[in-house]
Curated annotation (Swiss-Prot):
Name listed for the protein in its UniProt record: Uncharacterized PE-PGRS family protein PE_PGRS34
Region of interest (Disordered), residue spans: 349-368, 463-515
Species of provenance: Mycobacterium tuberculosis (strain CDC 1551 / Oshkosh)
Family from the record: Belongs to the mycobacterial PE family. PGRS subfamily.
Positions of the PE domain: 1-93
Top-level taxonomy: Bacteria, Bacillati, Actinomycetota, Actinomycetes, Mycobacteriales
Length: 515
């Protein structure tokens, strides 16, 4: 590590550049001296002579000023060069003194008092940072058949080292865990990515390493490592979990993603007192298997939003659930599901003030009774609105698929808050030669209930039907004391609309039924 602010080699290089600039300017001044100082008169008259003398006087004044500037420039370059030498000497002296100080601590505890830990050899852990100050070393990347090395831990102040990447193998090797941050200040290190699966059978990717925790008062948790890639036709490895944030302040780390699907994304790390939860890891697509999005981490106990749930492109897999907020904050949104899976539910809002997170959408389904939108999160405190329900999936397959139902809206807070709107039901496709019979449009989600003061959420609209049973709209949420009931969602093609929610008992109107 550098023991002074200045970098001597940079200062020396700058001084050399300045010297070169000075030489170029000096050469240009010398070349201009003769023609400018010896200007001939245009004629023999007195006016021409006076003009020539004026130009010559200006040239002489310029040359005198240039000489002074060149002297200052030379002195400045000498000062920079001398300063660089002084910095280098001071750094060498400090390093020597620090080596003497670190020696006993290294011998007794296996780590210096001040200084960064060494990076690990292939597959080996990084060295710990100094007891007083210093970052942990990075774990070494794994070779063939080797897991990634864990990142080194920090001491009192410093960041944990990053975990190494897992090595390739018949089954990919795990990535190394991120090191923990300093006991006072410092972030956790990121987990290493999982290794590549290369074997002929069961060649799945390695799991990502977990992110390091910020165990001190201040710091962010490290991100989980990405899952490794599987061989063609095989699943990837699961994503690593995110690390927790610092005791007083810090966000949880994000969960690791899964690029090739068929394994779950990593869960986001939790915050502790103040901070946001980490987002859950997202999942790519693979030919077979299940791969759900990671759940979002919870927000800080005092203040912080929940992390968003991870999304998934993998078939028959669900989006991750959003994390819950603490005392103040909003719940995280649920992740979406792309094919034959349900959207993730939204997280709950703060226990005092905060909104529920929105439910995740479901994009399409092949008719396997899945593909529902996630429910909106409830506002569980005194003030806050419920989250909106996610939209149901569109029916696109050949098994008489119906659209997925929309998610229900979350309830409003106990005192003041509106109910969340229900998600719309998914549509079905138009009958064709390939798909002669289609299912019903998805049912709209119900609107959420309001708090003592607030409006009920509107019901979701039914999905458009092909030749199946017309879809039904969702019911509107009801108000409690003061507020209007939510409107019912409209049905499709003559299908029943949802009922309107009742208005408040003290003041408010009933919601309109869906058409």
């Amino acid at each position: 590590m550098s023991f002074v602010v200045a970098a001597p080699e940079v200062v020396v290089a700058a001084a050399s550049d300045l010297a070169g600039i000075g030489s170029a300017i000096g050469a240009a001044n010398a070349a201009a001296a003769v023609p400018t100082m010896g200007v001939l008169a245009a004629g023999a008259d007195e006016v021409s002579a006076a003009v020539a003398d004026l130009f010559g006087a200006h040239a002489q004044a310029y040359q005198a000023l240039s000489a002074q500037a060149a002297l200052f420039h030379e002195q400045f370059v000498h000062a920079m060069t001398a300063g660089a030498g002084a910095y280098a000497g001071a750094e060498a002296a400090d390093a020597a003194a620090l080596d003497v100080l670190n020696g006993p601590f290294q011998a007794l505890f296996g780590r210096p008092l001040i200084g960064d830990g060494a990076n690990g050899a292939p597959g080996q852990p990084g060295g710990p940072g100094g007891l007083l100050y210093g970052n942990g070393g990075n774990g070494g990347n794994g070779g063939i058949g080797q897991p990634g090395g864990a990142g080194g831990d920090a001491g009192l102040i410093g960041n944990g080292g990053n975990g190494g990447i897992g090595g390739p193998g018949a089954t990919g090797l795990a990535g190394g865990a991120g090191g923990v941050g300093g006991l006072l200040f410092g972030d956790g290190g990121n987990g290493g990515a999982g290794g590549l699966g290369t074997g002929p059978v069961g060649a799945t990717g390695g799991i990502g390493g977990p992110g390091g925790a910020a165990v001190g008062l201040f710091g962010h948790g490290g991100a989980g490592g990405a899952g490794g890639l599987g061989k063609a036709g095989f699943a990837g490895g699961a994503g690593g979990t995110g690390g927790t944030g610092g005791l007083l302040y810090g966000n949880g780390g994000n969960g690791g993603n899964v690029p090739s699907g068929a394994a779950d994304g990593g869960a986001g790390g939790d915050a502790r007192l103040i901070g946001n939860g980490g987002d859950g890891g997202s999942v790519g697509a693979a030919p077979t298997g299940i791969g759900n999005g990671g759940n979002g981490g919870n927000g800080g106990w005092l203040y912080g939003d929940g992390g968003s749930g991870g999304s998934t492109l993998q078939g028959f897999s669900d989006g991750g659930t959003g994390g819950n907020a603490g005392m103040f904050g909003d719940g995280g949104n649920g992740g979406f599901s792309f094919f034959d899976g349900n959207g993730g539910d939204g997280g709950t809002g703060g226990t005092l003030i905060g909104n529920g997170g929105d439910g995740g959408n479901s994009v399409q389904t092949d008719g396997f009774l899945r593909g529902h939108g996630g429910d909106g999160g409830n506002a569980v405190g005194l003030i806050g609105n419920g989250g909106a329900g996610g939209a149901g999936s569109a029916g696109t397959g050949v098994f008489a698929p119906g659209g997925g139902s929309g998610g229900n809206g979350g309830n409003g807070a106990l005192l003041v808050g509106n109910g969340g709107a229900g998600g719309s039901g998914g549509p079905t496709q138009i009958p064709s030669v390939a798909v002669p019979v289609t299912g019903a449009g998805g049912t709209g989600g119900n609107g959420g209930t309001a708090g003592l003061i607030g409006n009920g959420g509107n019901g979701g609209a039914a999905g458009v039907s092909g030749d199946g049973t017309p879809g039904t709209g969702g019911n509107g949420g009801y108000a409690q004391l003061i507020g209007d009931g939510g409107d019912g969602g409209p049905g499709d093609s003559g299908g029943p609309g949802g009922s309107g929610g009742t208005g408040g008992t003290l003041a408010g109107q009933n919601g309109s039924p869906g058409g």
